[in-house]
Amino acid sequence: MIQQESRLVVADNSGAKEALCIRVLGGTRRRYASVGDIIVVSVKSVIPSSDIKKGAVSKAVIVRTKKEVRRPDGSYIRFDDNACVLLNAAGDIRGSRIFGPVARELRGTNMKIVSLAPEVL
């Protein structure tokens, strides 16, 4: 459950370490985003000598949330952190690696993220 001003870990090797959610996409009154949703983020911290700069605005897809997500079989999945993967203007992921596990809910729309992830829960 991510909303404006939520801080997220960036789970790819694009060069960004932390991002701040500045908008949840998908409607004018939409307040929260969950796993698989696309948000607009501002990069808050980067690794030295990275292509991405601090303050850069980018779209991102959420891959992990602390708030549990209910599955159709009645089970729940939750993670230890809130994490996202940065996207470019075309909607493809910016990095070439994904760090940490990702949720199975990404299979429908983000197969590239699922194929690069070390573990899908």
From Swiss-Prot:
Keyword rRNA-binding assigned: yes
Family as reported in the entry's similarity comment: Belongs to the universal ribosomal protein uL14 family.
Record-annotated disulphide pairs: none
Keywords, comma-separated and alphabetical: Ribonucleoprotein, Ribosomal protein, RNA-binding, rRNA-binding
Subunit structure, interactors included: Part of the 50S ribosomal subunit. Forms a cluster with proteins L3 and L19. In the 70S ribosome, L14 and L19 interact and together make contacts with the 16S rRNA in bridges B5 and B8.
GO cellular component: cytosolic large ribosomal subunit
The keyword Ribonucleoprotein is annotated on this UniProt entry: yes
TM stretches of this protein: none
Taxonomic lineage: Bacteria, Pseudomonadati, Bacteroidota, Bacteroidia, Bacteroidales
Organism: Porphyromonas gingivalis (strain ATCC BAA-308 / W83)
HAMAP family membership: Ribosomal_uL14
UniProt GO MF annotations: large ribosomal subunit rRNA binding; structural constituent of ribosome
Taxonomy, superkingdom: Bacteria
Name of the protein in its database record: Large ribosomal subunit protein uL14
Gene Ontology biological process terms, A to Z: translation
Function: Binds to 23S rRNA. Forms part of two intersubunit bridges in the 70S ribosome.
Gene: rplN
